């Protein structure tokens, strides 16, 4: 009986204390030199923790796959950047995650590095949301 209670308490603790891989709101900054304008866009992306391990030794029978919190489903949305010069491309397309999971990072479609995408601020002085 005590082991059942312990398992129940452990599962409750894990569910409340450890955030799993889930959708989260983020703000990205978009600017174009030909527009001399900057906007902030609210979107969703995946964040959280995934169970992973790093083996001390390499075992050819068990490949070492690091799992990361990444998108399972993705859509693209387009926004028009205001203030663009005539004939300048004022459209910017950005990804929006609609579902997340813990899985192997696909380097063909995702930046799997530790570094971020760079600064999340505008280099122009006029910022509009």
From Swiss-Prot:
Protein name as it appears in the record: Follitropin subunit beta
GO BP annotations, alphabetical order: follicle-stimulating hormone signaling pathway; G protein-coupled receptor signaling pathway; regulation of signaling receptor activity
The keyword Glycoprotein is annotated on this UniProt entry: yes
Homology family: Belongs to the glycoprotein hormones subunit beta family.
Gene: FSHB
Keyword Glycoprotein part of the UniProt annotation: yes
Glycosites: 25, 42
SMART domains in the record: GHB (SM00068)
Alphabetically ordered keywords of this record: Disulfide bond, Glycoprotein, Hormone, Secreted, Signal
One MF annotation (Gene Ontology) recorded for this entry: follicle-stimulating hormone activity
Listed Pfam families: Cys_knot
Position of the signal peptide: 1-18
Protein's cellular compartments: Secreted
Domain of life, per lineage: Eukaryota
Organism: Cervus nippon (Sika deer)
Cellular component GO terms, alphabetical: cytoplasm; extracellular space; follicle-stimulating hormone complex
Subunit structure comment from the entry: Heterodimer. The active follitropin is a heterodimer composed of an alpha chain/CGA shared with other hormones and a unique beta chain/FSHB shown here.
Protein's job: Together with the alpha chain CGA constitutes follitropin, the follicle-stimulating hormone, and provides its biological specificity to the hormone heterodimer. Binds FSHR, a G protein-coupled receptor, on target cells to activate downstream signaling pathways. Follitropin is involved in follicle development and spermatogenesis in reproductive organs.
Primary site of residence: secreted
């Amino acid at each position: 009986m005590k082991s059942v209670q312990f398992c129940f308490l452990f599962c409750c603790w894990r569910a409340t204390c450890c955030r799993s891989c889930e959708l989260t709101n983020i703000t990205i900054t978009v600017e174009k030199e030909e527009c001399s304008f900057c906007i902030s866009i609210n979107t969703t992306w995946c964040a959280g923790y995934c169970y992973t391990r790093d083996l001390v030794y390499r075992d050819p029978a068990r490949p070492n796959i690091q799992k990361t919190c990444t998108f399972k489903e993705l859509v693209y949305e387009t926004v028009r950047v205001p203030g663009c010069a005539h004939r300048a491309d004022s459209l910017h397309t950005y990804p929006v995650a609609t579902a997340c999971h813990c899985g192997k990072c696909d380097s063909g479609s995702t930046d799997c590095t530790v570094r971020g995408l760079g600064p999340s601020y505008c280099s122009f002085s006029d910022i509009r949301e």
